[in-house]
Amino acid sequence: TAPASLYAPSALVLTIGQGESAAATSPLRAVTLTCAPKATGTHPAADAACAELRRAGGDFDALSAADGVMCTREYAPVVVTVDGVWQGRRLSYERTFANECVKNAGSASVFTF
């Protein structure tokens, strides 16, 4: 038998697409983010994104907005999806932002890729 893992896995795939829902769009960009045992993946700020997710308890709706960001009221919807495992629990998340600026302001680093 395989040895027991010393940590619960945290491995995610994040995508961004233009549109109001993931079902109605194709991903424009995708990154991987692994947070255990250490921050790795193709996410450009893996360390910061993992730290931010840990502070939020893996709850994407609880991520803190980036400070001091001003965005236009332009409506060009961007949808973010997250699928994978966070601390051993499967998760699937989808959120639509009014535009790219609002998406980037939705977290300090998690959605900035």
From Swiss-Prot:
Presence of keyword NADP: no
An annotated GO cellular component: extracellular region
SUPFAM superfamilies linked to this entry: Subtilisin inhibitor
Pfam families per UniProt: SSI (PF00720)
Keyword Disulfide bond: yes
GO molecular function, one term: serine-type endopeptidase inhibitor activity
Intrachain S-S bonds: 35-50, 71-101
Domain of life: Bacteria
Site description Reactive bond, residues in chain: 73-74
Alphabetized UniProt keyword annotations: Disulfide bond, Protease inhibitor, Secreted, Serine protease inhibitor
UniProt-annotated location(s): Secreted
Signal peptide: none
InterPro entries hit by this protein: Prot_inh_I16_SSI (IPR000691), Prot_inh_SSI_I16_CS (IPR020054), Subtilisin_inhibitor (IPR023549), Subtilisin_inhibitor-like_sf (IPR036819)
Subunit structure: Homodimer.
Role summary: Inhibitor of subtilisin BPN' and trypsin.
Stated family: Belongs to the protease inhibitor I16 (SSI) family.
Protein name, entry field: Subtilisin inhibitor-like protein 2
Species annotation: Streptomyces rochei (Streptomyces parvullus)
Origin organism lineage: Bacteria, Bacillati, Actinomycetota, Actinomycetes, Kitasatosporales
